[in-house]
């Protein structure tokens, strides 16, 4: 569909949100999206576009906590953002509540949140490196790579780690 990106289809109350995202910052996605829609045998009713930041950004700005897209919590390679945003939002909420309750100073909550977010740097860097590699490998390698990644021994080792994000 899009070599340097991802496609999605989310059912929403009687209709669907279908889209494409580009890792390469490509902004001409309408034609590939229309081709994707034709393949699904659906017609678009409305188009909307934006960027989604993938890769950890600043978890705090001054005395403000950043969560989700504002902090770059979207996972590189997969484009998944909801689960990391919920996870980091919960961490943030617990720390803010601790500060409100007087259990920790506010500055300590900011510091603890930064530490919790930055503890995930390695995982984000690995996904970013995989994203970089996939974008540059010959198209003929993608099928065999997907088959390799789907092997039971590989899935058993890596899929639980991916699914356990934030646990």
Language-model features, listed with the residues they occupy:
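C-terminal helical "tail/cap" subdomain of flavin- and related membrane-associated enzymes
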Residues: 97-167
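FAD/FMN-dependent oxidoreductases across multiple families
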Residues: 22-101
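Short, structured loop/turn "capping" segments at alpha-beta junctions
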Residues: 16, 42-45, 123
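Short, small-residue-rich loop/turn micro-motifs
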Residues: 13, 68-70, 117
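Electropositive phosphate-/nucleotide-binding environments in soluble metabolic enzymes
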Residues: 3, 26-27, 79, 83-86, ...
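Conserved FAD-binding catalytic core of PHBH/FMO-like flavoproteins
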Residues: 1-30
């Amino acid at each position: 569909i899009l070599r340097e990106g991802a496609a999605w289809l989310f059912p929403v109350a009687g209709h669907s949100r279908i889209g494409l995202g580009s890792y390469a910052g490509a902004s001409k996605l309408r034609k590939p999206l229309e081709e994707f829609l034709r393949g699904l045998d659906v017609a678009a009713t409305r188009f909307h576009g934006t960027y989604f930041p993938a890769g950890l950004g600043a978890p705090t700005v001054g005395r403000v906590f950043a969560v989700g897209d504002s902090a770059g919590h979207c996972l590189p390679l997969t484009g998944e953002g909801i689960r990391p945003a919920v996870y980091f939002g919960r961490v943030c909420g617990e720390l803010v509540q601790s500060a409100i309750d007087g259990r920790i100073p506010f500055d300590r909550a900011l510091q603890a949140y930064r530490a919790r977010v930055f503890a995930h740097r390695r995982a984000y860097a690995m996904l970013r490196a995989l994203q970089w590699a996939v974008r540059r490998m010959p198209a003929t390698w993608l099928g065999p790579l997907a088959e390799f990644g789907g092997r039971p021994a590989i899935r058993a080792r890596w899929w639980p780690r991916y699914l356990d994000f934030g646990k």
